[in-house]
Structures are given as C-alpha cells and as structure tokens.
Amino acid sequence: MSMKSILSRRAFSALAGAAFIATAMPMPSFAAEVTIPIIVKDTTSFYWQIGLAGARKAGTDLGVKVPELGAQSESDVNGQISILENAVAGKPAAVVISPTDFKALGKPIDEAAKSVPIIGIDSGADSKAFKSFLTTDNTQGGRIAADGLAAAIKGATGKEEGEIAIITSIAGAGSLEQRREGFLDQVKTKYPGLKVIADKYADGQATTGLNMMTDLITANPNIVGVFASNLIMAQGVGQAIAENKLGDKVKVIGFDSDDKTVGFLKDGALAGLVVQDPYRMGYDGIKTALAVSKGEKVEQNVDTGANLVTKANMAEPKIDALLNPKIK
C-alpha cells in the first residue's frame, strides 16, 4: 500500500470521527433560534403599538423572533385566551403577555406556565405563575392622577373643592382597577373638599366615554373634574369637553397618550395625562423573557414608572420622549 493511500485513509478516518463527534454532541443554542411572542390587550391601540415597537426593537437587538399578537379590543377576553393557547402550542422559549382581564386570564396563564415561562407586563392576572412582572405602579398612578386633578381644579377655582367623577374603560382589568382604587383613596384621604359624584364603567369604546361624559355634564352642571383612567376614555372624555368648550370649567386628567390626547392637552380640553412607558415594558419584557429562558435570575417585580404631563412640562426632553416614541 502506498504512503499516499495510507494518508488518504487516515484523513478520511479523522473526518469521519469529527463528523461523529459533531453529530453526537448537543448543538449550542443561539438567540436567533429563539421565539418569544408578545400578546397585548389591543393591537389597534396606539399605546400598545408603542409596546409592540419596544418588543420589536428588543427582538432586533437580541436576535430573537418576536411574533406580535393580541386581541382587537380590550373587551375580547376569550380572543386573548385563544391567542395565548395557540402561542403556547407553538412551543416558544417564553411568552410575554398583558392580560385583558384579571380573573379570566388567571387559569389560562397557570396552564400556559406549565409549558413555558410567562412574563407579565402592564396588567396583572389572578395567577402566581409569572416569572417576572413589569408594570407601572398603577395604584400610585391613580394617586398621581388625583394630585394632578386637584392641582388643576385649584388652578382654575382657587380651591381644591367641587364635584368630580371617574370613568373607567372596562370592568375587571387589573391595571384599571388599581388606578381607580389609588385615585379614590387619594381623594378620600388628601382632598376632603372633592366629592366623587359618579364612579362609572364603560365598555372599552371611546364613543361610550364621549356619551358618558356628555351625560355627566348635562346631569351635573356643577362638575369641576374627571379622571379618565386610560387612553380610550381620555379620547372620549376629551372629545366631549372639546365639543362643549368646557376646558376652562371642567378639568380632566387622562391616562396614557396619543396624538389625539396630546392635541387635547395643548388645546386645554385635557388638563393633564399620566403617562406610562409602554416602550420599556415591551423591550424589557422580551429581554427578561430571554433571560428566563436561559435560566438566569430576574427581578420578580419591576416598576416601569409614570409621570404627570401638563401643558407646562410637555416640552421637557424626558416628557417629550414619552409623548413622541419611535414606533417604527
């Protein structure tokens, strides 16, 4: 046998051995292979478009595939449950979700968590299965709204007194209930001169908020303030104030922002907005989910913050960044 043949056989054996080892050894897991869906309450909401933009950016930065999922409205609870079940069936590395309803999503999240890690953002659920929960302290957000409303009323009348109301977008949403409780508690303990004459729930539609506010104005001509506890209600209530030219008389604090509510703020139909950071929730939600999927330790609860925005401070760089996020 020639030396050339011996070398060729040895080379072949070496290559075959290397191929066997490569086949036998587990392949490393790369971030590019990881899928982490984000499931929001309402994909049509500007607020949630900001959150999805944050998640999308995290996916790009971290090399993670991020399917952007969600119901068509916050009232579509069953739709979100189905989306969650389908997402889990795809065996992702983790799931990021903002539950539409505190009680209704509890058991579905418990069930999903048996298969994949669940990260919660924005709103809670009746479940202890979240590996981490990133949200505004919504109770504190309600208190901030009460302080802002009292200040606006005092600025207009010289005193923290008068009839006020609160309109909540939909019953049963954890974040909204916490805002409501924080607002009512702050008014009760800090502003005895403010009397809550109406505590109403809508159906998640801005038109309903508009109609409710119009009815409140008609039935309660002495009303001086309203807390509209989310973006949809701020849109509807702000529209009612604008149409009736009552910005000087009835002060409204909304929650969250978009072009319409910022316009109302500039024009005086709204006195203030409590603004969260949904971009951070989306970005850090994906980042946290990836860490959990790798077995890393993460914080159980993360407060993503809230700020009172008024016409006086809306041009400040920090506030401007919250009002004008990059969503593309």
Located regions from the model:
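SF2 helicase/translocase NTPase motor core
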Residues: 1
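A residue-level marker of the well-folded mature domains of exported/periplasmic proteins
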Residues: 4-6, 29-328
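N-terminal export leaders
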Residues: 7-13
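Sec-dependent N-terminal signal peptides
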Residues: 14-19
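C-terminal segment of classical bacterial N-terminal signal peptides
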Residues: 20-29
